[in-house]
Amino acid sequence: MKQIQIAIDGPASSGKSTVAKIIAKDLGYTYLDTGAMYRAATYLALQHQLTAADTEDIIRLLDDYSVSFGRSESGQQLVFVGDVDVTNPIRENDVTNNVSWVSAIPEVREKLVSLQQQIASQGGIVMDGRDIGTVVLPDAELKIFLVASVDERAERRYKENLERGISADLEVLKKEIADRDYKDSHRSVSPLRPADDSITFDTTGVSISDVVAFIEEKAKKILDK
């Protein structure tokens, strides 16, 4: 049966992961949350009190503590660093506020992109991140770039944080998301931008089910060719 690669990119809290998980489940594809991989690398760096000047040490840690994924009994994606479950710690504010500088380190990106491409080569996949369509899967059959207003994305992050028991201030989140947008789109390595052949979709005010339906319709057209 024909299988394709689906790349979903976009800024923080644009709905990438939520949508990608549903689509992967519906199609029976592998789902890969690349953002969680960079968060895991950031968690490692912070645990060892490393900075952007400690590139070699960060790479050494990634060699020593592999980043892997699992599933809970309820179907929730679990993230491990070595054999430690870091699913919740990597969503804490300190990781969120530091992931931009870690993910901007060329050697970190090179290492994780290689792993992402290796996983993608094994069959149908839905992968979300910030450079999937431009760098990780440049030949993906379907590339989607999700956007949404800063206000809406801050509201989404605010609700997510409260559900996870993480303290949150809506106005602070708006500033943090705007700052993250700037850093992600202006970094020298793999800046956040839509691929030339991607489809941009504004999710502001659009339900998750409608976004999923839009993308799955595009995927079906490709699969039916």
From Swiss-Prot:
Binding site for ATP: 10-18
Any single GO BP term: pyrimidine nucleotide metabolic process
GO (cellular component) term, any one: cytosol
Cell compartments where the protein resides: Cytoplasm
EC number annotated for this UniProt entry: 2.7.4.25
InterPro entries the record matches: Cytidylate_kin, Cytidylate_kinase_dom, P-loop_NTPase
Chemical reaction(s) catalysed: CMP + ATP = CDP + ADP; dCMP + ATP = dCDP + ADP
UniProt GO MF annotations: ATP binding; CMP kinase activity; dCMP kinase activity
Keywords: ATP-binding, Cytoplasm, Kinase, Nucleotide-binding, Transferase
Family recorded in the similarity comment: Belongs to the cytidylate kinase family. Type 1 subfamily.
HAMAP family: Cytidyl_kinase_type1
Name of the protein in its database record: Cytidylate kinase
